[in-house]
Design a protein with these regions (language model features):
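An N-terminal-biased, well-structured beta-alpha scaffold segment characteristic
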Residues: 1-95, 194-196
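Short gly/ser/thr-rich secondary-structure transition/capping motifs
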Residues: 30-35, 53-54, 131-139, 181-188, ...
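Short beta-strand elements at the ligand-binding edges of bilobed clamshell
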Residues: 93-99, 188-191
Length: 216
């Protein structure tokens, strides 16, 4: 008998196809809308695995609903939605994908910094409104600011923070960072010093009680 796997959010059909000989997949309908907690708790049957994009908070209520559960796979970097201590007690495997979005997130972060520094959003609107030839354009009007020589303060220096730093260095930026339990690096600064010194600040800390509402 095939094992039943619950997938709480859209997953590419071509990816699932190669596993259908061994598993039955329960997927959301419509597929592009994540399952609500109510929908998950309404499912009947022996579920042995859950593939989740971190929308579903997995707690005692969920685990009691699916007593045959053996593994929960988070398609995300974080595990904030999982009660890891409880899963360990119940001997249920928990996995995540810590490196899957590192480069994508770092690329987007660098793009946002460029958009801000070079005023690309404002310039784009200016051109699309056809103001370019009629509104007194002057050279340098949308130049913005150089990144070279500017200081980027990174809050949270894990895989993503380091990937952002590598990209920023290629633009000639100076890198400082703050991270819990690290204070010996010459680039380390306290949070207050980082906020005072930085020209740009990029936040990449995991969500914890300490980081919740860290910046307003």
């Amino acid at each position: 008998m095939k094992k039943k796997i619950l997938i709480t959010k859209h997953f590419p059909d071509e990816t699932l196809e190669s596993f259908k000989s061994s598993f039955d997949f329960l997927v959301p309908k419509p597929s592009f809308v994540p399952m609500s907690r109510f929908e998950v708790l309404s499912i009947k049957g022996k579920i042995e695995g859950i593939i989740n994009s971190a929308e579903l908070k997995v707690d005692n209520e969920i685990l009691n609903k699916f007593p045959s559960l053996k593994i929960i796979s988070n398609i995300s970097i974080g595990t904030d939605n999982l009660d890891l201590e409880l899963l360990s007690k119940k001997r249920i495997w928990a996995t995540n994908t810590p490196l899957s979005f590192v480069n994508s997130t770092a690329d987007c972060t660098m793009a946002f910094i460029l958009i801000l520094a070079r005023r690309l959003r404002q310039a784009d609107i200016y051109v699309r409104k056809n103001l370019w030839p009629n509104d007194g354009f002057t050279p340098g009007m949308w130049d913005g600011n150089l990144l070279s020589g500017k200081t980027l303060g990174i809050i949270g220096y894990g895989n993503i923070g380091k990937a952002v730093a590598r990209r920023a260095k290629s633009f000639g930026m100076k890198i400082i960072f703050t991270k819990k339990n690290i204070s010996r690096s010459k680039n380390y600064r306290s949070l207050n010093d980082l906020l005072r010194i930085s020209d740009f600040i990029s936040l990449h800390a995991p969500l914890t009680d300490d980081s919740y509402h860290l910046l307003n």
